[in-house]
Regions:
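N-terminal leader/targeting and accessory segments in enzymes
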Residues: 1-98
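Walker A (P-loop) phosphate-binding motif
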Residues: 101-120
Length: 120
């Protein structure tokens, strides 16, 4: 799926690169990144996903979604970013949720909910 369709309504802005690149997967775990993936750097409670940006690029990520500009600069200053699109997110957690929904064609919209209420 094209990156511009994946980041739709996610609060993201492309800072460097191409919006029309094809993305094969969306990951927030650098161990699961494959060539053609988009990596979302999420700040966690124990670790910061920004610390794994260079690993994701090394594994072939085509897009990096980041929240912290200073952290991005620290990790990519000496790397070759040819073919990598950098995308700034207001909230990487929100961006990840919206990107996953877009990538998988909004599966929650296709669910049928049934509620049964009553007493006893």
């Amino acid at each position: 799926m094209r990156l511009d369709r994946i980041i739709r309504n996610s609060g993201c802005t492309i800072t460097v690169g191409d919006a029309f690149v094809e993305i094969d997967a969306v990951c927030n775990d650098s161990r699961k990144v494959t060539r053609g993936s988009a990596f979302v750097a999420v700040k966690g409670y124990a670790t910061d996903g920004h610390d794994y940006i260079s690993i994701a690029i090394g594994k072939g990520a085509k897009a990096i979604i980041y929240e912290d500009q200073a952290a991005l600069d620290r990790h990519v200053e000496s790397m070759d970013l040819d073919g990598v699109t950098l995308i700034k997110a207001e909230s990487s957690r929100f961006a990840l949720a919206m990107m996953a929904a877009n990538f998988y064609d909004n599966p929650s919209e296709k669910l049928t909910l049934v509620g049964i209420t009553g007493t006893n």
